[in-house]
Amino acid sequence: MRRAICPGSFDPLHLGHCAVIRRATLLFDEVVVAVSTNPNKTHRFSEAQRIELVREVFADDPAVVVEPLESGLIADYAERRGAVALVKGLRNGADYDYELPMATMNRSLTGVETVFLPGEPSLLHVSSSLVMEVAALGGDVTSFVPPEVLRALEDE
């Protein structure tokens, strides 16, 4: 089985994330969506809430497994999970410049490859932080997040 890890905080999960995850399932037998918690960030949703939301959105796809990202190096986590690759979505050159050194380091540590998937053109402007900002200011984020996430945002 060819397994890939798609790591991220997914706070909140948006349609750009969903597109990358769905496309990754076309390349790999299993995609582990590893939900991380950054201690240096304030998260809108708890780790448990984010995991549940991702599970709800991908409930119809048996190739998607959702779990918390263990602390430590992502390269070590990928090795423990038997993953052949990490999958990262890229919206622009700045994302590439940010991700490339990490991809190179991960490969040098354990040999895990990183597969970069370009973002969907219609979603290149979407980020979790922008979704949160627009939602906090009362804007309509319907076209940026899955219905499950929209409901969770409205319930907050």
Swiss-Prot record:
It comes from Kocuria rhizophila (strain ATCC 9341 / DSM 348 / NBRC 103217 / DC2201). This is Phosphopantetheine adenylyltransferase. One of its GO terms (cellular component) is cytoplasm. ATP binds at residues 9-10, 17, 89-91, 99, 123-129. Its cofactor is Mg(2+). Homohexamer. Keywords: ATP-binding, Coenzyme A biosynthesis, Cytoplasm, Magnesium, Nucleotide-binding, Nucleotidyltransferase, Transferase. Its EC number is 2.7.7.3. The record marks 17 as: Transition state stabilizer. It catalyses: (R)-4'-phosphopantetheine + ATP + H(+) = 3'-dephospho-CoA + diphosphate. The gene is coaD.
